[in-house]
Every structure is written in C-alpha cells, then in structure tokens.
A protein has these predicted regions:
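Short secondary-structure junctions
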Residues: 40-51, 99-103, 225
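Hydrophobic/aromatic-lined pockets within catalytic cores
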Residues: 80, 96, 100, 197, ...
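Conserved nucleotidyltransferase catalytic core and NTase-mimicking acidic/glycine-rich helix/loop elements
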Residues: 2-9, 140-275
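Conserved NTP/Mg2+-binding pocket subregion across the NTase superfamily
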Residues: 2-28, 32, 83-183
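Short, well-structured alpha-helical interface segments that form or flank functional binding sites
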Residues: 67, 123, 187, 191
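Short, solvent-exposed polar/charged micro-motifs at secondary-structure junctions
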Residues: 61-64, 115-120, 240
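Catalytic metal-binding acidic patch
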Residues: 54-88, 106-109
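A short, contiguous, amphipathic alpha-helix enriched in charged residues
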Residues: 31-40
Length: 275
C-alpha cells in the first residue's frame, strides 16, 4: 500500500480502519450519547440486548449542532420482535424531543446471528466492524474479519441500489410537505453519494464516509461524465443540507440514481439476494 494509506482510511496493512470513537464526540453531543446509552439500557434488558453502537458524524467528530442526526445500531440476542421495534421507536422519539442538538434519531435493529452470518459478512458485518463505534456490550467486530476496499465489498454494500428506486419514486410522489421532501432528499442523496464512492472504491484503494470527499473521488474516475460529476456534487451538498425542491429530487431519483444503478451492476454485479 502506498504512503497515502493513512489518509485514505486504511491501516498500515491495507485493511479499512474503523472510523469514529467516543473520544471524538463533540462536547455539544456528549449529553446526547450519554442519554442514548442510558435509555437503551432502560428499554432493553440484558436478555434482549447484546450490544449497541453509534455511527455517523457524531462519533466521527464532524457533527453540527441542530443539523446532524443521531444514528444508532442495536444488536439483539435474537431477531427483533414487534415489541423491540416499538421500544426502539420510543427511544428515538424521546431523544429527538429532548435534545435540540440533533435533527432526528434513527435506531437500526438486528440480531447477532444476522450480523455475523456469511450472507451479511460484507454488508452489515462490514458496517458494524468499520463504521460503528461501540456504546454498550461486547463489540462484535472481534468476530468479524478485517476488511479491504475490494470489488466484493463494493458489490455487497451497494450492489442493490436499483432496488431503492421504486421506493424513492413512491415517496416522492406521495410527499405532501417540505419536511417529507427534505427527509427523502437527505436519505436518497446520501445513499447515492456512498454508492458513487463505492463504485470506484477498489480503484481508489481506500475508504471515506465524508460526502464531499466521496463525490470528488467519484469525479476522479469519471472525467468523461461531467454532468454526472456535477450531479454527484449536488447530491453531496443536499446530503448534508437537504432541499425540498422537487427539481432536485427529480435530478437525484429520475436521472442520477438510475444511471448509477446501471453502472454499478455493469461494473460490480448484483448484490447477493436476501431472503
């Protein structure tokens, strides 16, 4: 690996370095993380919860008060039930209501068997091992491999982008408020930028979760597609500061995303199907 590996999110051996740390949580968000830990513990006892993680801009140290959201991953000992989902939604709502520093809370639920399965090894397993910061319980990263920026990782992380298109189109058609359009814009834009990055990740030989950097890495490998490059840069901008403009949603969902999904399948193939 070249001397720039550290600047590309890699360890010295070329594996992807885990991003984020509780020590990097900005002071303004420390009470939010502490409350999340306490409320998760209160909502899920030791017979249900195996471990909990925080991910995104807060543990990376780049969160902006009033703009950034709180992202959590809760790993249960068995597959989540309806009661577990309800408990997670209550934790989300309580944290969002009590802390103005955050603009929304999202808690993903899964199980230990799912995270450590062969099927999820290069998707959810990678996500936990490299993009999530331990908050509670045993860190499952110890049961997972070290990951490299390979075509296999690219395929399994975002090789199903095409499946998101019908859902985004339906949400765009049904959106009745600016808040709904902004929520869709942020989610779709982030997924598009991350897919644009992982499309070229094996060539770049590194990892980043920074949206602006991801768009520029994509641009490096698609100089003959200036329109797509500018659309990807737009996606990076609205991924951080979402727009309610229907024209922006149309550009992302009806133009850039279908092209990117087709390009992804051509380069890396289809993600292994899930049951």
């Amino acid at each position: 690996m070249d001397d720039d590996s550290g600047g590309r999110g890699l360890n010295e051996d070329g594996t992807i370095r885990r991003e984020g740390s509780l020590s990097r949580v900005p002071a303004a968000f420390a009470p939010v993380v502490a409350a999340a830990r306490s409320r998760i513990t209160g909502a899920f006892d030791g017979t249900r919860l195996h471990s909990a993680y925080v991910y995104g801009s807060i543990p990376r140290g780049t969160a902006v008060p009033g703009v950034s959201d709180l992202d959590l991953l809760l790993v249960l000992r068995t597959r989540p039930t309806g009661a577990d989902e309800a408990a997670a939604r209550a934790v989300e709502a309580g944290l969002d209501a009590d802390f103005g520093q955050i603009d929304g809370v999202g808690a993903l639920l899964t199980s230990t068997d799912t995270v450590t399965s062969e099927l999820e090894r290069h998707d959810l397993g990678f996500f936990l091992a490299c993009l999530c910061t331990p908050l509670l319980g045993e860190d499952l990263a110890g049961r997972l491999p070290r990951y490299r920026p390979t075509p296999l990782l690219a395929r399994e992380t975002n090789g199903d982008l095409v499946l998101a298109l019908p859902r985004w189109r339906r949400r765009a058609a049904e959106a009745a408020t600016d808040a709904e359009r902004r929520s869709l814009c942020r989610g779709a834009a982030r997924r598009i930028v991350r897919s644009g990055f992982t499309l070229v990740m094996p060539q770049w030989r590194g990892w980043t979760s920074d949206l602006a950097e991801s768009a520029e890495v994509f641009a490096r490998y698609y100089p003959d597609h200036p329109e797509r490059v500018e659309q990807m840069r737009l996606a990076a901008r609205v991924g951080r500061g979402p727009s309610a403009d229907p024209a922006v949603l149309t550009t992302l969902i009806e133009d850039l995303a279908p092209w990117l999904a087709a390009e992804y399948l051509a380069v890396h193939g289809e993600k292994a199907p899930r049951p």
